[in-house]
Swiss-Prot record:
Name by which UniProt lists this protein: Lipase chaperone
Subcellular location as annotated: Cell inner membrane
Segments crossing the lipid bilayer: 14-34
Keywords: Cell inner membrane, Cell membrane, Chaperone, Lipid degradation, Lipid metabolism, Membrane, Transmembrane, Transmembrane helix
One GO term (biological process): lipid catabolic process
Membrane topology: Single-pass membrane protein
Disulfide bridge map: none
Zinc is among the record's keywords: no
GO molecular function, one term: unfolded protein binding
Role noted for this protein: May be involved in the folding of the extracellular lipase during its passage through the periplasm.
Length: 344
């Protein structure tokens, strides 16, 4: 196993999950490929959190157990809840996209027809016999049409971030495709993300305008920030806090600070609770690295045993389930296995 295999940068994960909390950093997301595929295992709401933002989640008892018939990449996970409005219809919410993105995580394991069948089963597990079931299937077909159209763009609609004209074109193309394929679902699926992307692009245009002085740039950036809705401004503050914390943690790691020294310094700037979470993540990270290294060694033995592809994959999947028993761990290991396989 390489030094990078089995891990994401601790500094970034500590901030995103342990220090500041999740924030929607969408400014870079649009330039990637056809879709965001959600890490699973802890993504669903608890049954108690059944009412949010005027919608209700589908009844918890309708869900299929996570271990039943899931593709290998989703083993040990469960689908996010599909939200319903007060009338029992599918609520127009970003949570619906999250559900489909969860299902799309399995696309490397399934054919196109197999993926459609899997999504139909997951929808039925929550909405069988309801009016929302047909609505969810219709939205799925719309979302697939969006992703298919996006994939036909040059480089799947990705753009060189140094070319502001290309960025603007990519953004406009994606927005047009979303509206054409998703209709009134384009706003709940991508509205907030597209607003953030346009805001970030406007900032880039100001920052890179050679006709402006530094003072003029600062003035225009401040004026642009004032146009932000209050919730977006709060999100931007979270992003700024994240970046500062990431830089601090990375610098402490680079300097070789001991866990106690890192915790002491982070306590001063982030507070004792956040510092304690970072320390716990360090311990969890070390434990994960050790277990993944042991697992990777056993996986290599299986791969070298001359088994048929079917038997090999079955044994590796069984090994993952034995070694990684916490929610989401087997999914993470499977994802890392695919990355390691493509690198070999």
């Amino acid at each position: 196993m390489t030094s990078r295999e089995g891990r994401a940068p601790l500094a970034r994960r500590a901030v995103v999950y342990g220090v500041v909390g999740l924030a929607a950093i969408a400014g870079v997301a649009m330039w990637s490929g056809a879709g965001w595929h959600r890490a699973t295992g802890a993504s669903g709401e608890s049954p108690e959190a059944s009412v949010a933002g005027g919608s209700v989640t589908a009844p918890p008892q309708a869900a299929v157990p996570a271990s039943t018939g899931l593709p290998p990449s989703l083993a040990g996970s469960s689908a996010p809840r599909l939200p319903l409005d007060a009338g029992g219809h599918l609520a127009k919410s970003r949570a619906v996209r999250d559900f489909f993105d969860y299902c799309l995580t399995a696309q490397s394991d399934l054919s196109a027809a197999g993926l459609d069948a899997f999504v139909m089963r997951e929808i039925a597990a929550q909405l069988d016999g309801t009016v929302a079931q047909a609505e969810a299937l219709d939205v799925w077909h719309r979302y697939r049409a969006y992703l298919d159209a996006l994939a036909k763009l040059r480089d799947a609609g990705a753009a060189d971030k140094s070319d502001l004209g290309a960025l603007q074109l990519a953004l406009d193309q994606r927005a047009s495709i979303a509206y054409r394929t998703l209709g009134d679902w384009s706003q709940p699926f991508f509205g907030a993300e597209q607003w953030r992307q346009r805001y970030d692009l406007a900032r880039l245009k100001i920052a890179q305008d050679p006709t402006l002085t530094d003072a003029q740039k600062a003035e225009r950036l401040a004026a642009l920030e004032q146009q932000m809705p209050a919730d977006e401004r709060a999100a931007q503050q979270h992003i700024d806090q994240q970046r500062a914390a990431i830089d601090q943690i990375a610098q402490l790691q680079k300097s070789g600070a001991t866990p106690d020294a890192m915790r002491a310094q982070l306590t001063q700037t982030l507070g004792p609770e956040a510092a304690a979470r970072v320390a716990q993540m360090q311990q969890d990270d070390a434990s994960w690295q050790s277990r993944y290294a042991d697992y990777a060694a056993q996986r290599t033995q299986i791969e070298s045993a001359g088994l048929s592809p079917q038997d090999r994959d079955a044994q590796i999947a069984a090994l993952r389930q034995r070694v990684f028993t916490r929610p989401g761990e087997a999914v993470r290991a499977a994802s890392l296995d695919r990355g390691a396989g493509s690198a070999r």
